[in-house]
Each structure stands twice: as C-alpha cells, then as structure tokens.
C-alpha cells in the first residue's frame, strides 16, 4: 500500500478533501438555494470565485514558502467557513458574490498550502505518491460533499446544509491545529 499512498500526508489530503467537499456542495446546491430564495444571476458566483482563485494562486506561492503551515491553513479554513455561513444566510445577489470572494480566498490559500505540505513531508523519490495522495483526498471530498449535502438538504433545507458545512469546517480547523501541534512535537524538525 506504501506504493500508492504516502501515509505521512494523509491528514493533509483529508483536510484538502474538505475544501473539495465544499466545492461539491456549492456546485450541487448553490443553484437550488438561489432558486428557492429568488437570487438572480447566481452563475456569476462561479465566475467571481474563479477570478479570485486565479489571482490568489498567482500570489500565494511565495507566502507559502515563507509562512508557517498553520498560519495559512487555519485562517483559510475559517475564511471558507465564513463563506459557507454567508451562503446559508444569503438572500441577495451581493451577499452571494461576497461569499464567492471569501470562498476563493480560503480555498486558494488552504489547498495550495496543503499540497505543498504533502510534497515537503516525503523524500524526493516519493513526491509523485504524495501528490497522488493529496489528489485522492480531494477527489473523495468532491464526491462525498455532494452526497452528504444531498442527504442533509433533504432532511433540513439548503440554508441549514450550508450552515452545517461551515460548522464542520470550523471543527476541522480546531482538530487540524491540535494535530499539527502534536505532529511538530513528535516529528524531527528536519523531516517537517
């Protein structure tokens, strides 16, 4: 199994999967939420999100190389959670567009940082396996988010589903902080 997965970066891949789960939820349920609430031109969410995400990816690389992982991933998770809370609350076009910006900022900082961490935590001969592990986590998250979002929205409603997503992201931010602090105490500094 070591030939297919880099166990050193499974936690990073799972957290990255949470960002992808958010993508699956937004892609599947933003339009029905907008129709339910009468929010027009909802497709602009995806355009705004893509533009900000593109700009974020152009600029975040240098910051990632100089900044502690926790100082990027945890705020990115919290910003993402805020965006899902905004979507859950939204009743107007502009609130959804603001959420698009925040979602891109969170996703852009978080996923790139986690991918970089996956690559850094393995020897050079396992970079491909680490990258594959990262993307497996992202792929699982994408599918799982849509499925779980469908179950939650069928029991409650779309707004509640987005609120619950925000809560899960905040909890994961806390758990990731605990994990990373513990990992740093147990892993030699030159392996981090």
Residue ranges, per PLM feature:
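Short hydrophobic/alpha-helical segments at membrane-entry points of transmembrane helices
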Residues: 12, 94-100
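Extracytoplasmic gate region of multi-pass secondary transporters
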Residues: 8-47, 53
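Loop-to-transmembrane helix entry/capping segments in MFS-fold secondary transporters
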Residues: 124-134
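A membrane-interface helix-boundary motif in multi-pass transporters
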Residues: 151-169
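Helix-breaking motifs and short loop linkers at transmembrane-helix boundaries and internal kinks
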Residues: 68, 89-91
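Structural signature of the two symmetry-related core transmembrane helices
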Residues: 71-86, 166
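Helix-to-loop junctions at the C-terminal end of transmembrane segments
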Residues: 56-68, 153-154
């Amino acid at each position: 199994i070591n030939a297919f997965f880099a166990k050193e970066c499974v936690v990073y891949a799972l957290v990255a999967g949470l960002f992808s789960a958010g993508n699956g939820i937004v892609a599947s349920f933003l339009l029905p939420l907008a129709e339910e609430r009468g929010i027009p031109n909802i497709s602009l969410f995806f355009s705004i999100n893509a533009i900000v995400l593109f700009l974020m990816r152009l600029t975040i690389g240098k910051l990632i190389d100089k900044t502690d992982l926790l100082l990027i991933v945890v705020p990115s998770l919290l910003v993402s959670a805020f965006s899902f809370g905004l979507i859950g609350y939204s009743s107007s076009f502009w609130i959804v567009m603001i959420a698009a910006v925040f979602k891109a900022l969170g996703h852009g900082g978080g996923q790139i940082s986690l991918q970089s961490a996956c690559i850094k935590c393995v020897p050079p001969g396992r970079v491909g396996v680490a990258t594959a592990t990262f993307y497996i986590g992202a792929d699982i998250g994408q599918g799982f988010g849509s499925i779980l979002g469908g179950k939650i929205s069928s029991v409650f409603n779309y707004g509640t589903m987005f609120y619950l997503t925000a809560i899960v992201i905040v909890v994961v931010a806390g758990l990731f902080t605990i994990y990373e602090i513990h990992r740093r105490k147990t892993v030699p500094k030159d392996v981090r």
